[in-house]
Amino acid sequence: TLFDCRTEPVYQFRYPGNHYEDFNSIPDLIVQSLLFIENRDLLSDKNPLVNPAVDWPRFFKAALTQVGKALDLDGQSAGGSTLATQVEKYRHSEDGLTYSPQEKIRQMVSASVRAYRLGENTLEARKLVVWAYLNSVPLSAAPGYGEVHGLGDGLWVWFAADPQRVNQLLDTRLNQSVDLAEQGLALRQVVALMIAHRRPSYYLAVSGRSDLNTLTDSHIR
C-alpha cells in the first residue's frame, strides 16, 4: 500500500489476492488435510520442544533414495523437505528450488533458527509454518493471471472456486447445515492442490489432471 503525505492510501495491491490473516482463520479441515499429507505430528503437543525443520527418518529416507537414483536402482523417490524447509525454499532459495545438498542444509538451519525465535516451546512457531505454507505454496502459473501462490488463489484460478465459500464449507464451526456433496467437492479441491504442489506445472496442466485425480482419489476414500 502506498500512502500520501496525509497517510491516505493512493494505491493498494494485494498478492496473493486470497490469504489467511492468521492461523486461527484457517478452517480445521484444511489444516487436518495438510497434516495428513505432509506431517501428521506437526502440531502435536506431546513434544513441545520439537524442531519442525528436521524430520530425521524422512531426511535419511530421502538421502537413500538419492543414492539409489545415482546407482540407477529402481524405487519410488522420496522427498526430505519438511513444511518448514519448504517455506524457506519458496521464499529464499534461488528459483524456489534446491540445487545442492549445501542449499538443503542452509534451508534446515534457517528454518530451525526461525522455529525457536519465539522460545523453546515451538508450538506457535509450528502453527506459523502451516499458516505461511498455505499462503505461499507455489501452484504453477495460469494464462492471463501469472504465477499462482497460496491455497486461496489456487482454488480460484485452477478450480474457479470461491475461496471464502470453501473456507465456510470446511470450517466445522460454520458448516453444520451445508450440503455434503458441496462440502466433499471443496475438500477434494483442497486436497488436489496440496498434492499438486509436488509437480505443479505438470499436475495442474491439462495433460496431468488425470494423474492428479487418481492421486486425489487415493487420499480421499
Predicted regions and their residues:
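Short beta-strands and strand-coil junctions in structured, solvent-facing domains, enriched
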Residues: 21, 40-44
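Hydrophobic/aromatic-rich, well-ordered segments within soluble, folded domains that form packed cores
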Residues: 28-31, 124
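Non-catalytic, structured segments within soluble enzyme domains
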Residues: 75-221
